């Protein structure tokens, strides 16, 4: 029970930072949905751009967060050597990615439909490269059981972002959607500066043999991560390419993206649980009663997520005021998206069996099947049912 109490304490800290952060982020939804008229498609651009960067984030971390936890807790390799190797690997690939993408910025932006505003894409490419690098120091904070600093840095980003967005979109009555991306870049840079202590005080070593083992372990998790993030963002990436009316696509995507934000309450709970549960599982894997603790953790997770689902459904008539009135037409997707997030949380909890026995290939198999179904449904049905096909997929 002591282990479960520690898990509950850390989940509460991670959860409060996540819940407070997401709640404060909700302030951006009424700001954007009132400052950016639905017919402008501005919120659709934001939805699409953040979906693309979410996928890139998974690609650029390529499962190394979980790999770091696994090898740091194994007791075979020096944890700081594992941290250094992970940091150098992810940092190098993020830098290479950024150089290549910025070299071909105009063709990439044109392909994605932002040929007239390539700087939108340029700013977000820099953001996602920095985010990928920061993911490893954040994982290190979780490994060292320092949830307070973890939460403080996350909240710093949120508060700075909200303050700047309010200043521009409310105070200055601005309507340039590109400023939202510039604000994200500024706030991400601020967090990077505040993370300097996690980047000094140790010897940087790239252990190639260790890296080879970590990549072998982490690659199937990358496939799992791609499938997991596609479950959340594939619809928002595919939608502009498949929807029959290209001009209307960003409008409809904006409505769907705004309404889906209400369902993100479930994502908050699953994310908070994940932040605490992942290091908890690996640290307790050698104890005799570990399976019993995992089962109890799953039971409480399901209970709390079901209560959250019911609470949102009961108070949806109040929660809808988070959105601008023109976006209310999309509220019918909320229960569907919330249920999907709950099932993803359950799947994440159950997926640890193959991570603990180093058989992560099974995660890749399951993920490829699920990902294929999601993409197929979106491509086949968006043109017929619009964003409702996205929700059901």
Where are the model-predicted features located?
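Membrane-interface junctions at transmembrane-helix termini in multi-pass inner-membrane proteins
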Residues: 71-74, 130-153, 202, 339-369
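Helix-terminus/linker motif at the lipid-water interface of multi-pass membrane proteins
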Residues: 26-42, 109-110, 173, 226-265, ...
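Interhelical loop/hinge segments that connect adjacent transmembrane helices in multipass membrane
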Residues: 1-7, 148, 178-179, 193-232, ...
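Helix-loop junctions and terminal segments of transmembrane helices
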Residues: 31, 60-76, 259-299, 351-356
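Hydrophobic alpha-helical transmembrane segments
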Residues: 118, 122, 151-200, 224, ...
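Signature of the first transmembrane helix
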Residues: 2-65, 94, 98-102, 127, ...
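Interfacial segments at transmembrane-helix termini and the short loops linking adjacent helices
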Residues: 39-40, 105-124, 250, 312-344, ...
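C-terminal transmembrane helix end/exit motif
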Residues: 7, 68, 136-143, 147, ...
């Amino acid at each position: 029970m002591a282990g479960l109490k520690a898990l509950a304490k850390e989940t509460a800290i991670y959860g409060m930072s996540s819940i407070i952060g997401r709640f404060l982020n909700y302030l951006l939804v009424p700001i954007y949905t009132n400052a950016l008229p639905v017919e402008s498609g501005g919120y659709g651009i934001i939805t699409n751009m953040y979906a693309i960067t979410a996928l890139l984030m998974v690609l650029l971390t390529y499962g190394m967060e979980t790999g770091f936890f696994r090898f740091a807790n194994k007791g075979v390799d020096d944890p700081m050597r594992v941290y250094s190797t992970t940091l150098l690997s992810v940092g190098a690939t993020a830098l290479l990615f950024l150089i290549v993408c910025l070299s071909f910025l105009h063709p990439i932006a044109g392909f994605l439909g932002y040929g007239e505003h390539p700087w939108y894409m340029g700013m977000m490419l820099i953001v996602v490269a920095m985010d990928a690098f920061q993911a490893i120091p954040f994982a290190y904070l979780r490994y060292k059981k320092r949830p307070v600093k973890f939460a403080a840095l996350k909240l710093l980003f949120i508060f700075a972002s909200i303050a700047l967005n309010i200043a521009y979109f409310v105070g200055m009555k601005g309507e340039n959607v590109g400023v939202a991306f510039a604000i994200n870049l500024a706030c991400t840079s601020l967090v990077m500066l505040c993370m300097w202590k996690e980047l000094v005080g140790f010897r940087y070593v790239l252990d190639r043999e260790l890296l080879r083992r970590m990549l072998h372990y982490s690659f199937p998790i990358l496939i799992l991560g791609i499938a997991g993030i596609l479950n959340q963002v594939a619809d928002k990436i595919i939608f502009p390419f498949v929807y029959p009316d290209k001009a209307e696509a960003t409008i409809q995507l904006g409505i769907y993206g705004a309404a889906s934000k209400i369902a993100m309450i479930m994502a908050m709970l699953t994310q908070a649980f994940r932040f605490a549960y992942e290091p908890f599982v690996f640290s307790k894997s050698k104890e005799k009663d570990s399976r019993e603790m995992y089962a109890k953790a799953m039971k409480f997770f399901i209970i709390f997520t079901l209560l959250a689902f019911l609470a949102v459904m009961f108070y949806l008539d109040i929660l809808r005021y988070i959105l601008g009135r023109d976006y209310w037409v999309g509220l019918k997707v909320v229960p569907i998206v919330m249920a999907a997030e709950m099932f993803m949380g359950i799947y994440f909890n159950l997926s640890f069996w193959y991570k603990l026995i180093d058989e992560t290939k099974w995660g890749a198999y399951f993920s490829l099947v699920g990902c294929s179904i999601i993409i197929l449904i979106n491509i086949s049905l968006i043109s017929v049912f619009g964003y409702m096909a996205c929700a059901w997929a």
